[in-house]
Amino acid sequence: MGERITLQRLLEMQKKIWNFKISVDPETAELVAREQLKSFGQLSRIGILVTLPLGIYALVMLFAFAGPDYIAVSSFFLVIAGFMGGRNYFRQVALDPDTADYKAVTRSIVLESIITGIAFSSILSIPFAFGQIPFSLDIAILAMGGLALGGFVYGSIPRAQTYYLLITTTIHALSFIAAEGYAGISAAVLLVFFALCIDYIFRMFFFNFVQRHIHASRQKDAAETVRLLLHDYAEQSSDWLWEINDRHLIVNPSARFASALKME
């Protein structure tokens, strides 16, 4: 019975994370969106540094196995991926998340995730699909590393993360099948499973990220409400003040208190 309840709660939590939508007032939604941009700006700069060794490793494999034509095509996609990464870096440096048009910036990030996903995954997938690079553990590591890196960079923008993972996984899976035939199906299925795990993990991080900010916003609103109530109570209480003399008789009553006792 306990195991069934635990499994049921786990499935409910998973469904809640996959179908999560921010149902709060516009002010809180904007606060969360701006915090997303701040988080993305920090993570994307780290992601660019991590991308460098992956790109260098991919170039080494290209020059070791692929022909000149495929090296040229892959270098073209590498330049596109590098351009998008540099564009994103300099935009985030100049961006002020507190004043920027967060909707326009988010749309730009989503578009960048699509272009980056196509470019970054095509660097090795195209020469590998046409037999220029032999299938090895290095190919699988680079493919999985690209998925994990994309989930890390775009994790604070779920739509961008989904597009990147979907495009990258599809291109790599098709290249596995094209290069290895039926033998590549198992590798493609494993890659899809890995991508789903990455997507779920970073969605869970985003879910907790949003819940923390919503809770903090509600706590702030509750504290402000209590402050206003206490202020109102103090103002109302001051209307009923009075003083007493040495004989314990009321003197200097407030206007409201005197009016109530008809002492004026």
Tell where the protein language model's regions lie, with residue ranges:
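Short, charged cytosolic
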Residues: 2-28
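Hydrophobic alpha-helical transmembrane segments of multi-pass membrane proteins
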Residues: 22-27, 39-96, 173, 192, ...
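Hydrophobic transmembrane alpha-helices and their membrane-interface boundaries in multi-pass
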Residues: 55-56, 60-149, 167-169
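Membrane-helix interface "capping/anchor" motifs
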Residues: 150-163
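Central hydrophobic cores of alpha-helical transmembrane segments
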Residues: 161-172, 191
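Juxtamembrane or sensor-core-proximal signal-transducing alpha helices
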Residues: 190-226
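Sensory modules in modular signal-transduction proteins
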Residues: 224-246
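PAS/PAS-like sensory domain cap-loop motif
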Residues: 247, 257-264
